[in-house]
Design a protein with these regions (language model features):
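A glycine-biased structural micro-motif
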Residues: 19-23, 46-53
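N-terminal basic/disordered segments at the start of proteins
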Residues: 4-14
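Basic, nucleic-acid-binding surfaces and adjacent catalytic neighborhoods in DNA/RNA-processing proteins
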Residues: 12, 22-44, 57, 177-310
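A residue-level signal for conserved active-site and pocket-lining positions in enzyme catalytic cores
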Residues: 7, 61, 75, 128-130, ...
Length: 310
């Protein structure tokens, strides 16, 4: 379930390992692309190897690698996808793999046995390898809900990026932009808990962020957008920025005046989340779990009735 702050950490991780290095081979090892056929333009890209990785960027929950010769690799992580790295000559053993900053954060809040199981399971599902002379970057995905796609040409990239709403962490996504997107006519009769997850409206917010954002905002997730005041929308916006930037880069969040001495994050209460997948909140109130989603993929919202009155 990686969300925008984690996607940005993966982008930094991949950039650190592969930027300005040549990819000399790509192998499909496991997962959906092994069993159902390779991702689009896989064979074409392989024929053009070696090829240098120039940069790694993100928009919302989409990560994309910029290569030479106008190639782009697009990555979505689904529920269980991620990236890890193994130096050349090292055996594929748990302690030899490098993981992103995300793993450090999880290890501080998840039991050791669960983390150990997660890492082992990830290594057992290395689905795609991008090899350089210095080592290999692996895409892992235990459930194979994530995707990899190769496209060619800046026009194709821009076409994809235009399908996504403004990135919630982007500096240009200010309150005016946020409010305009949230209050589009198509959203007015929808629950705010659904609208926040619509990647065409605002990109980057997923299931756990929406629960915690609305909890901090003291807004019931089933409230319709047309029933929210401008003041309430501002509170939601502020907490979107706080939870995404606060988890990603505290120093930068302080510089941007998103995080201040009064700001609180889940880690301040020794928790991974405020209410997502929790039995009680930080005050001991019962957390309610209910279905709230659009489309075919079932999603649950977590909220506290005493704090988030309808």
């Amino acid at each position: 379930m990686p969300e925008i702050n984690e996607i940005r950490n993966y982008a930094l991780f991949i950039s650190d390992k592969l930027k300005n290095k040549e990819i000399i081979d790509i192998k499909i090892l496991n997962g959906r692309y092994k069993h159902k056929g390779p991702f689009e333009h896989y064979e074409t890209l392989k024929k053009d190897l070696p090829i240098k990785l120039l940069d790694v960027k993100t928009k919302g929950k989409l990560l994309y690698m910029i290569l030479e010769d106008n190639y782009y690799i697009l990555s979505t992580l689904g529920l269980s996808g991620g990236w890890c790295y193994l130096k050349a000559g090292k055996k594929e053993e748990k302690d030899n793999f490098d993981f992103s900053k995300n793993m450090d954060y999880y290890q501080g809040h998840v039991a050791d046995d669960k983390m150990d199981s997660y890492i082992k399971n990830s290594i057992n599902h290395l689905n795609v390898e991008f090899k350089t002379s210095k080592g290999s970057l692996f895409y892992y995905d235990t459930l194979s809900f994530g995707t990899i796609k190769v496209i060619k040409g800046i026009d194709e990239l821009n076409k994809k990026l235009k399908t996504l709403g403004p990135d919630i962490m982007d500096i240009g996504t200010d309150l005016v932009v946020f409010k305009t997107q949230i209050k589009k006519p198509k959203n007015l009769e929808k629950e705010i808990g659904i609208v926040l997850m619509d990647q065409k409206t605002i990109s980057g917010i997923g299931n756990y962020l929406r629960s915690d954002i609305l909890y901090l905002s003291k807004i019931n997730p089933f409230r319709k957008v047309n029933k929210l005041s401008d003041a309430e929308i501002k509170i939601i916006f502020d907490n979107c920025k706080l939870l995404t930037w606060g988890e990603f880069d505290k120093k930068e969040a302080k510089r941007l005046k998103i995080l201040n001495k009064n700001s609180k994050l889940p880690e301040d209460y020794d928790r991974l989340f405020f209410v997502y997948n929790q039995d009680t909140d930080i005050h001991g109130n019962k957390v309610i779990k209910k279905e709230l989603y659009e489309g075919s993929q079932k999603r649950f919202i977590y909220y506290v009735k005493e704090i988030q009155a309808y």
